[in-house]
Amino acid sequence: MTGFLKANYHTHTYRCQHAYGSEREYIEAAIRMGIAELGFSDHVPCPFKDGYVSGIRMTMEQAPEYVYAIRELGKEYASDIKLYVGFEAEYIPEFFKEQKAMFDRLGCDYMIMGQHFMKSEQTGPYTCLLYTSPSPRDRTRS
């Protein structure tokens, strides 16, 4: 079969607190697999005002270093793979304006949506848990 996009735009780093390995390890694995484009998309930081610390995303202070690290690796591996840097974000109105300003200020390439929470992670349920039961199609298999 031909025509498959050899790309991955949903790659997290250690900064999101639930990924393992270094950016370099991810890049080298992608090259070995024949991936042409690799996008890093850590969970976007949220500017929590009350001191809340997320367990699934980097802090606002880590964002510039994250973008810088991926950009530097992009230069190093430019002859082998195209790297992109962005964020995976939920649409949470109270944070969106500040997140968008940070995204623009840092010169990110893209943002993907991953609506893990219906509201802020402080006030809303983790919605991914709503979809963990088998699908109706899976229940009919023996």
Predicted regions and their residues:
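Secondary-structure boundary/capping signal
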Residues: I81, Y110, T140-R141
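Hydrophobic alpha-helical segments and helix pairs
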Residues: E90-S133
